[in-house]
A protein has these predicted regions:
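Membrane-water interface at the C-terminal end of transmembrane alpha helices
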Residues: 128-145
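Hydrophobic alpha-helical transmembrane segments
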Residues: 11-21, 42-45, 64-76
Length: 145
């Protein structure tokens, strides 16, 4: 008879620092942001409009102002990846809450009139990620003074 005992292995579940959680959520958000725009290039007629100097289905002309606004919008999650890791706790918390809420407003407003399922689905996921950012920042761990 085999008398060997098997011991259960319990996996360690290390606590993840709030700054790393927030930065990771911003990374995921930024990738979705980029991929939504990238896949939008596959929509019939979009490339032709870009070649003509126009944003498809909007009537907006592609100009320096448009591109500056676009890169500024894209820069926000890029900078938040770094800022979430480096800002002091109080500034970090409020920056993530405020920027997260502002990004939600931008994304939801971009949904107006949208009919492509991929865009709607990705935006919902982005909003969920941003809500997690706001939630984690709001619930920032406290320590005794």
């Amino acid at each position: 008879m085999n008398s060997e005992r098997k011991t259960a292995t319990i996996l360690e579940d290390p606590k993840i620092n709030i700054k790393i959680k927030l930065s990771g959520l911003w990374v995921a958000n930024m990738f979705l942001f980029i991929y939504v725009d990238y896949f939008g290039l596959y929509i019939p007629g979009v490339m032709e409009k870009i070649i003509e100097g126009e944003v498809a289905h909007t009537g907006i002309q592609i100009s320096q102002v448009f591109l500056l606004a676009g890169i500024t919008l894209m820069m926000i999650p890029s900078l938040m990846i770094f800022l979430s890791l480096t800002l002091p706790a109080k500034a970090n918390r409020w920056t993530n809450i405020i920027v997260g809420i502002l990004q939600i407003v931008v994304l939801v407003s971009a949904l107006i009139g949208e009919s492509w399922a991929y865009y709607i689905f990705a935006t919902i996921v982005e909003v969920v990620l941003l809500l997690l950012i706001v939630w984690y920042a709001w619930k920032w761990p406290k320590q005794e003074a």
